[in-house]
Amino acid sequence: MEQRAYQATKDELSEINKCAIEEIDSYLSEVGSPVLLLLQAHLYSENLLERYIVTELPKGKKLIEKGRLTYFQKVQVAGAIGVMDNNLLSSLVEFNKARNNLAHNLNHEFTREQLKKFSLPLGDVSAEFTERANGCLAEELRLTINHLVSRLAGYTITIEKLSGKYS
């Protein structure tokens, strides 16, 4: 399958970025607890993955509605489309593991090691977020999640806008 190239002007990209930031803020800005932030961001990122698949695949809607795909499988389908970068995909897989640890073990405590597993694939921003958080795990988590979800939203909203499916 040939990888599709998307062409967008600087103004279109600026508008897409603005839409992504507004959308993320509407879902995640009021979440205070680190655990709730992780869970809410996971739900939102899953929605973004579904929208991405529906927009990119001719029968994507049927796949999402009838396929009973797990989060991990949705990441794999998104990766198979061939547009998203591998670092983002790796980070999403590790993010899902962290969410599963929290969701399936009520006594589980989120750790910096878990955060690093999904922040390191994001590149240099991982170290920047560690420094900016000044030792506060909750703040480092917030910065990392916002960046992770923003990157995913960027891909999703870009293809939705360029295909005319963004609402």
Regions found by a protein language model. Name each.
Residues M1-G79, V83-S167:
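Amphipathic alpha-helical interface elements
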